[in-house]
Amino acid sequence: DPAMNARLATAVDKAKKDSVPRDVIERAIKKGAGTGDEKLIMEHVVFEGYAPHKVGVIVEVYTDNVNRTAPEVRVLFKKGQLGTAGSNKFLFDHVGLVEAHHADANIDREAAAIEAGANEFEPLTHEQNDDIPEGAAGARFICDRTAVHAVVKWLAANGWNVVTSELGYVPKQFPELTD
């Protein structure tokens, strides 16, 4: 039930934006839930590790075969180091991320974030996300994972065009990188 599962609701919203037919979405939900004709047990696996220069990385994967997927993910960490569960999750906040824009370039983004139920916001420009038109007020709203759907609904009802909504990891501290 997407109303009870924020991750599923986000995936369904993303599929609808990409014009995926309703029957395909419903079939994928049944397949992932292990019901219907095509039973498939999908497993959620989180890989944690460090890229070169000690940059923390978290990779979330849904797979029907962990034994096949794990070596493929290890290849991504070949110049870094694949860690164990919990090795770097403390470096990140697991949050909901909603990116949107409003035609009024002078709209109060902070007030919109508060009203929508987001914890924080960051201004976004066309250079940062090409889905945001030039001259529009763009913002990335950061909220609790369970509040993504409510934030999207409020923004859409108040004149914002939602570009993306997803669950993700935001670093608590950004590392300094050099060439």
Question: At which residue positions do the language-model features occur?
Answer:
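Flexible, glycine/charged-enriched surface loops at secondary-structure junctions
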Residues: 2, 22-24, 85-88, 163-165
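Charged, alpha-helix-enriched surfaces in structured cytosolic catalytic cores
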Residues: 3-10, 19-24, 54, 68-72, ...
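Translation machinery proteins
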Residues: 4-61
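Signal for well-folded cores of large energy- and translation-related assemblies
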Residues: 12, 16, 30-33, 74-78, ...
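Flexible glycine-/small-residue-rich
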Residues: 29, 49-51, 59-63, 100-102, ...
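Active-site phosphate-binding and catalytic loops of NTP-dependent enzymes
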Residues: 33-42, 81-87, 120
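RNA pseudouridine synthases
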Residues: 45-96
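Positively charged, low-complexity, intrinsically disordered RNA-binding extensions
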Residues: 99-179
